[in-house]
């Protein structure tokens, strides 16, 4: 009893600490649940209203309908034909949709021993089987060796000479959207049609991120892989897309407050940006950025291992709000432990690289928003991800 009484303050402090973390976990669970409901409702409403979207004939004769340059970076991709079939089957005027496959020169020099030929040659063979009007929609470019890998491939596909061939010399970059899909993506055929309808309705944004589900190869995964596929897909639903939807709502709410109470808004703006703004998440596929915006950013970021996360931070630093795209896209989850480890290592390398980007952004513009992005990134990813890397193997994943 003497020992218990002597250590009472210690146990009380431990009780407070565990109560805090349990409360935090319960709050995060509630937020995630609300995020899942928000995204699911957003997607369900969009699919229920598909019949109200303008069809191909209307979009073909609408002068304000956007033009899409849809990029597919590829490297050793034997099953790329499935992605190209899905993209070329989009319900959008074929003269306003251009699919560009960007391969690497390294693959030509070192073909994969298990592939019958290179990815570029597979695409060319696939194109030869298409009708003439679809052949015109599909282009193949080969990026030389350089740092940046995927980002370099994407930027190479957007060179002026390539765009001039696709769009002509008098194209308006504000009416051109650059889409990105992985070589294992299966996008919904109504994706471009939904985006065009949003633009024509006056709601068009400079960038969009769509709902992605890592379920394309679900049947080929073992039980652990299926759990990871469901978990990763749930993160996209309850966090990534929900955050985009709610961020637009929060900023719109604050704009209304500023219009009604400008003095109050000016006083609380730093607190709002520091405590209530959230980072925008780009996933690297099923994303669209307006060409003029992408050019203003200097193209896809090449300084980090993950150009997608850096792109989201760069858009946020410039005050550009991304729109959520409700159409679904299925992608593969790595099917082997080796591929999964390499994917996660690349992601974490990108997390570390983004620390430098966010630090430079904050030093260049020391705003509460940029400070919040840096602090949250360090706390939520740089610190929590290594902990997860230790905990998951212990529990069997």
Where do the language-model regions lie?
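Active-site-proximal specificity loops/subdomain of glycosyltransferases
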Residues: 110-175
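Short aromatic/hydrophobic "clamp" motif used to bind/position activated sugar donors
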Residues: 178
């Amino acid at each position: 009893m003497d020992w218990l009484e002597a250590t009472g303050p210690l146990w009380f402090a431990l009780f407070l600490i565990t109560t805090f973390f349990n409360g935090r976990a319960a709050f995060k669970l509630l937020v995630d649940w609300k995020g899942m409901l928000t995204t699911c409702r957003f997607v369900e409403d969009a699919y229920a209203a598909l019949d109200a979207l303008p069809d191909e004939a209307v979009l073909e004769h609408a002068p304000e309908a956007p033009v899409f340059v849809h990029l597919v970076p590829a490297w050793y991709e034997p099953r790329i034909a499935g992605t190209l079939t899905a993209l070329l089957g989009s319900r959008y005027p074929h003269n306003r949709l251009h699919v560009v496959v960007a391969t690497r020169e390294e693959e030509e020099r070192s073909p994969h021993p298990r592939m019958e030929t290179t990815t570029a040659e597979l695409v060319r063979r696939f194109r030869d089987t298409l009708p003439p009007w679809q052949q015109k929609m599909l282009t193949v470019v080969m990026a030389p060796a350089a740092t940046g890998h995927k980002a370099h491939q994407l930027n190479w596909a957007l060179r002026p000479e390539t765009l001039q061939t696709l769009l002509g010399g008098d194209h308006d970059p504000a009416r051109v959207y650059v889409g990105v899909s992985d070589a294992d993506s299966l996008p919904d055929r109504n994706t471009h049609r939904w985006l065009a309808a949003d633009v024509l309705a006056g709601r068009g944004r400079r960038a969009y991120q769509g709902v992605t589900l890592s379920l394309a190869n679900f049947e080929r995964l073992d039980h652990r892989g299926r759990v990871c596929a469901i978990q990763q897909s749930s993160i996209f639903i309850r966090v990534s897309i929900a955050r985009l939807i709610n961020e637009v709502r929060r900023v719109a709410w604050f704009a209304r407050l500023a219009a009604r109470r400008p003095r109050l808004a000016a006083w609380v703006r730093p607190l709002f940006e520091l405590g209530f703004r959230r980072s925008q998440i780009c996933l690297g596929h099923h994303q669209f950025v307006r060409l003029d915006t992408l050019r203003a950013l200097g193209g896809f970021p090449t300084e980090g291992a993950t150009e997608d996360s850096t792109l989201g931070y760069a858009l946020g630093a410039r005050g550009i709000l991304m729109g959520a795209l409700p159409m679904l896209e299925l992608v593969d989850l790595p099917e082997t432990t080796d591929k999964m480890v390499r994917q996660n290592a690349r992601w974490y390398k990108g997390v570390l690289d983004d620390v430098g980007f966010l630090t430079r952004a904050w030093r260049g513009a020391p705003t509460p928003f940029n400070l919040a992005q840096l602090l949250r990134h360090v706390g939520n990813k740089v610190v929590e991800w290594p902990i997860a890397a230790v905990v998951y193997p212990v529990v069997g994943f």
